[in-house]
């Protein structure tokens, strides 16, 4: 269903606890990618079985294959090839993928993201991105060896609502910062998505920081 029907994601299903802080999951990405691919192979391991699906140019080929697993295994593997009849410009710089994967590693602490780039037939360059302590390690990396202050990390989780007539939702916050006379940078992420222009979180952070200093 996720690969064949638009808006089939479970992000907004009540209570939605599995997806409260997730990027995407509206039911668009997987389906749109499948329709825009020359082929897509999906393998899902769960509940003691391995499930396989094969698509070609937006159509499922054959039936779903179900194979019992002999050992406990979970996870999903998706392989696809963009359809050149859909994507006419595929000259995407490798640095773009490096940047995206590094940022995902920053906000998904302890998860390794591996980039494999084919430099010649059968030969790959591999680069891993891993931040065991998430944004804390990222701030320490940016600040270098001689920051004015050591990195500080705050975490909090709250419940609230935008208006009295709106349902409550959870907010989970992670903030890491330090003072440095060499690096001047502020970055913001929402549900693991990098906010290039900062948006509301940037304004809120600046106002709160100045207010706290004034109060002190």
Where are the regions a protein language model picked out?
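Active-site-adjacent bridging/hinge elements
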Residues: 3-12, 75-77, 174-187
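GHKL/Histidine-kinase-like ATPase module
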Residues: 95, 102-104, 110-216
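Amphipathic, well-packed alpha-helical segments that form the structural scaffold of globular domains
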Residues: 3-8, 79, 206, 210, ...
């Amino acid at each position: 269903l996720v690969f064949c029907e638009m808006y089939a994601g479970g992000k907004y299903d009540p209570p939605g606890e599995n997806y409260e802080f997730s990027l995407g999951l509206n039911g668009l990405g997987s389906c749109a990618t499948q329709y825009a691919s020359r082929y897509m192979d999906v393998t899902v391991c769960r509940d003691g079985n391995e499930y396989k699906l094969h698509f070609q140019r937006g159509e499922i080929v054959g039936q779903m294959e179900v194979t019992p697993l002999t050992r406990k295994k979970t996870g999903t593997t998706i392989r696809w090839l963009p359809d050149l009849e859909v994507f006419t410009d595929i000259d995407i710089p490798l640095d773009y993928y490096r940047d995206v994967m590094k940022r995902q590693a920053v906000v998904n602490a302890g998860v390794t993201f591996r980039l494999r780039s084919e430099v010649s037939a059968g030969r790959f360059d591999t680069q891993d991105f891993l931040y065991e302590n998430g944004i804390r390690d990222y701030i320490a990396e940016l600040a270098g060896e001689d920051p004015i202050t050591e990195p500080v990390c705050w975490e909090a989780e709250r419940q609230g609502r935008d208006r009295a007539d709106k349902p409550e939702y959870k907010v989970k916050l992670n903030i890491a910062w330090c003072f440095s006379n060499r690096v001047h940078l502020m970055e913001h992420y929402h549900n693991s998505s990098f906010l290039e222009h900062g948006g509301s979180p940037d304004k809120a952070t600046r106002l709160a920081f100045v207010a706290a200093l004034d109060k002190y």
